[in-house]
From Swiss-Prot:
The keyword ATP-binding does not apply. Keywords: Cytoplasm, DNA damage, DNA repair, Endonuclease, Hydrolase, Magnesium, Metal-binding, Nuclease. It is an enzyme of class 3 (hydrolase). Belongs to the endonuclease V family. One of its GO terms (molecular function) is magnesium ion binding. It comes from the Bacteria. It comes from Roseiflexus castenholzii (strain DSM 13941 / HLO8). The record marks Y79 as: Interaction with target DNA. The lineage of its organism: Bacteria, Bacillati, Chloroflexota, Chloroflexia, Chloroflexales. This is Endonuclease V. DNA repair enzyme involved in the repair of deaminated bases. Selectively cleaves double-stranded DNA at the second phosphodiester bond 3' to a deoxyinosine leaving behind the intact lesion on the nicked DNA. It is found in: Cytoplasm.
Length: 222
């Protein structure tokens, strides 16, 4: 696949905010996709002054690894909470462009609508690629939620400024929840179902585990 940004890299903070507002206006929050046969885990981290992105494509629902790519790109945007897409997305887009298989769904290690301006990396990547996308984060960026039952699959809305922006989801009993939010072309309820379908015996979905292992260890867990 050959995704590309509809805006230049880099941008300054003022431009970044305008871009986020424009992307947010394009986010589709209902189910708008065909059959999902492949799902890609997306993760990005930092090495010195570079962003390192890893993407692993898994068959769905078997979760067998089919394709992967890594990309490194010089960081040109400052570290500002709420604007990390502008540091990470260029490298992720490079990795996506290197794939042999175009995934049917992106599952990002980060947020979608659960973001101060409702435009986390899952929204950014979903709109730029026009692929259905989900944010599945390890911690809260914005919002709060009610206590969550200690039962696999239990979830409760994540609310911010009187708006439901995502969900706290218990993937396993006895572990901290993950935080699921809409990225693009997927409803929140469906996003939760996809995350649970990608969870095996660990807290995190296999998409996240595979991309994180590829980025940090250079291998995909079996």
């Amino acid at each position: 696949m050959k995704p590309s940004a509809d805006h230049p890299w880099p941008v300054d903070l003022g431009e970044a905010r305008v871009i986020q507002e424009r992307i947010r206006a394009q986010v589709i929050t209902c189910d708008a996709f065909g059959p999902i046969r492949t799902v890609a885990g997306v993760d990005a981290g930092y090495s010195g002054d570079s962003a390192l992105a890893a993407v692993v494509v898994l068959a769905f629902p078997s979760l067998q690894a089919l394709d992967y790519a890594v990309a490194r790109r010089q960081i040109s945007f400052p570290y500002v909470p709420g604007y990390l897409s502008f540091r990470e997305a260029p490298a992720v887009l490079d990795a996506l462009a290197s794939l042999r298989i175009t995934p049917d769904l992106l599952m990002c290690d980060g947020h979608g609508l659960a973001h101060p301006r409702r435009c986390g990396i899952a929204c950014h990547l979903g709109v730029l690629t026009d692929l259905p996308s989900i944010g599945c984060a390890k911690s809260v960026l914005v919002g709060a939620h009610d206590p969550l039952p200690d039962v696999r699959g239990a979830w409760t809305p994540l609310r911010h400024d009187d708006e439901i922006v995502g969900a706290a989801l218990r993937t396993r009993p006895g572990v901290r929840p993950v935080y699921v939010s809409v990225g693009h072309r997927v409803s929140l309820e469906t996003a939760i179902q996809f995350v649970m379908a990608c969870v095996t015996r660990y807290r995190l979905p296999e998409t996240t585990r595979a991309a994180d292992a590829l980025a940090s260890q250079g291998r995909i867990p079996r």
